[in-house]
Amino acid sequence: LINKYGSVRGERGLPKLLPGLNFIAGLNGETESSYQMNLDLLHEIRREGLLLRRINIRQVEGEGFQDIPQKAFNMFKTNVRDTIDGPLLEELFPLGEELSDVHWETHDGRTRLTAHLDETHTSESCRGKAGITFGRQIGAYPILIGVEYHIPLETQSSVIVTGHGARSITGVETGLQAEKVSQKQLEAIPGIGEKTAWKLISQRAKRKRKNPGQEAFDSAEEWFKATSIDWSEDYSLYFDHQ
């Protein structure tokens, strides 16, 4: 019932409400077969087409608890991450899905530092420069989102999902402007890459030198065609519609 109604995507691009599961290893009475039973349960959930927002696997240790069979525990954890978590992540955050209201937290690492409050990290001047920006949507157990260029911290924006990690996803912002987008921003768009991005930036610079004070191109599509680069409708997901 929760999946029936909770799997509907809301305004921010996420399913509205999904359950999570916690597996605790080391409880009294547990045996090695317990891990296989837990894995069988997860596979049954997936065969039924049900979604889970998260799966936590924890170890309980200390006086009064039994020893954990490490080999069985590690195999269970690896199986869950490889056969359950990966496919779930791709289904929850499919390629091309737009996620809105992402809050940008850190540059070039997942740990929030005092330095990240400096103007060098929060001002608009850092946008599009080389590096990685990490952010999340507000909520319980928000997915970590990485973007392969700098975005001013303490800001929010929308992204298109472009890839999946083990426990995170990558994305590229929407609303990129052909007049301002940097080479690093272009490189982050699937299907473009470093060489094509350099050609586009060079063509824009030439056009601006030829027509100073004017916009180089009326649209991203015109820009690509003027650079002899095939335009894909997929690119329109990322660019501002002028």
Place the predicted regions along the sequence by residue.
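Intrinsically disordered, low-complexity Ser/Thr- and acidic-rich flexible linkers and loops
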Residues: 10, 126-127, 210-215
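Catalytic cores of secreted or luminal carbohydrate-active enzymes
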Residues: 50, 56-67, 72-93, 97
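C-terminal extensions
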Residues: 176-188, 199-202, 210-242
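Conserved C-terminal portion of the radical SAM core fold
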Residues: 1-66
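Terminal RNA-binding accessory module
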Residues: 77-179
